[in-house]
């Protein structure tokens, strides 16, 4: 059996992806010269997208360690490889501190304005923001390193049990800091869970896409996926889609019935103009269509059909992040959205290079286990 992960053509492709990603990202950085605000807004979207995929892969892996099942064995090479991309998060975060004043209104708020909300004024300061970011990222790095170790068989479930709690807490708090505080007067008590559900869909869809796509092309030499495993993978993706829809709708319903101006304005900005159409697209393409498609037993058994569903959900994950972040900014949402897509593609080249490097290492390790 031929494993293309170590072939010269595979290495050449990896280098081309990295080169293209770096060039695209550097060209994106040139926007700093004439529109630094738009660049940092776009960069935040790209950072949240790729860091979310990395963290989502980690939570899926921890769930597998706790529950077991052959479905996890199918995705394990890519989930383990995604742990290596967690190491990219501190590097990708580096530009954000330089754009705090352009991203977050609270970073430049006056003392008089801060007096109206003293608790938020204490919490939302640039120094404390960066300290918390270092704590979150530090926890993620330690967790990724522990899960990457090949220790005793019983180690990973224990690490995963504690890791899930750490993950939920750190992602919830980081979602408040990095996204919710873009509009510092707005808040939602389940916002962190919304982001967790989105990250899970993005990471699971990407792992599924890579697994099936390589098998379709005959570039994966591991054992064939059985009908039961295919059904399990489809059902798990369906469950994640339903969970995302449930949490997202619950947040909307709570705010709708609360009918408080400081909460309702967040949805007004995201259901007006072009963002209203984006919201409808998310309802249809992120929930209704995948829900209908994943109800089909035949589709779950069809790798080609599942790659299409996974690709759709990855695109919707990006659109979801865009919808959560960009309406918080004052203007130029069209320009920022286009720039965000450009920077996301560039950052993706670097992310993919690291992932494929980890997959190449992981394959021999899997064969020995």
Residue ranges: model-predicted function:
Residues 30-39, 177-185, 322-330:
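Juxtamembrane "helix-exit" motif on the non-cytosolic side of transmembrane helices
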Residues 2-54, 121, 355-361, 369:
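N-terminal regions that are enriched for targeting/export leaders
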Residues 53-63, 90-96, 133-144, 197-212, ...:
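Hydrophobic cores of alpha-helical transmembrane segments in multi-pass inner/ER membrane proteins
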Residues 8-29, 120-282, 299:
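Long, contiguous internal "core" modules enriched in hydrophobic/ aromatic residues
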Residues 47-154:
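Transmembrane-helix bundle segments that line or gate the permeation/cavity pathway
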Residues 189-195, 262-283, 327-358:
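Membrane-interface transmembrane-helix boundary segments in multi-pass integral membrane proteins
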Residues 145-152, 215, 353-368:
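Membrane-interface capping segments at transmembrane-helix boundaries
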Residues 305-315:
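Central hydrophobic cores of alpha-helical transmembrane segments
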